[in-house]
Amino acid sequence: MMMTRRNFSTAIVAGAAASLISTHGMAASNPAAASGAAKSVPLKARNVVLAHGLFADGSCWTEVIARLQAKGLNCTAVQNPLTTLPEAVASVQRVLDRQDGPTVLVGHSFSGMLVTEAGVHPKVSALVYVAARAPDAGEDYTALAKTYPTPPASAGIVFDGDEGRLTEEAFLRDFAGDLPKAKAEVLYAVQEPFHKALLTGKTTQAAWRSKPSWYAVSTEDRTINPDLERFMAKRMGAKTIEVKASHLSLISHPDTIAHLIVEAAGH
């Protein structure tokens, strides 16, 4: 049977609800950050907009969203078209325009580019990067990434004409390596292809220079080099946690990522 986005989202929501009783561990950059994440934080922002990156769609945020909604937050997952950077940024801006007040903007992976560009929106009160790109304004991210060892997932990208995707082997091993195989296979089946043109764009803004920022480094990441993640987090002065996770910490450690977003919402 073909897996549709609706079927997939329904299945993940059910799994998220069942797993709410479990707690995932978090390694923070300092003990205070780890303990503070678990405390109740008064919410100043009631809205959260979440953007997905390459090899995924908006449903990748479902388990995190379930936890945020349980905290009373209004959540919207952007369906990033993965066509060009301006079109992807516009998809985020349209969702931000609809928010009714202060909003936390969250991005995973490639969508850190969108957070960096669209995060200057006046409704955005805080930025959260989850194993995400965080370039400076006008910076060539590809050139920056080349100053670090190439992550294994890069070798698994294949193209059908102008559309790129990850092979199943690379997806399971290098993108979703800490997920149960059955769940990773479902995620592979719904990965959204990206256009080559998407990778040529450069941000013109650096929202992290003017907005408070949080960053979750994935220490076992095989899609973005963890040391590159640490560099970007330090450069932006982000409050940083380290999660022993693959690139998909938002799925393997949804409690941890939700705690980080709630903390940003309380800023």
Which sequence ranges carry the predicted segments?
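N-terminal secretory signal peptides and thylakoid transit peptides that target proteins
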Residues: M1-G15
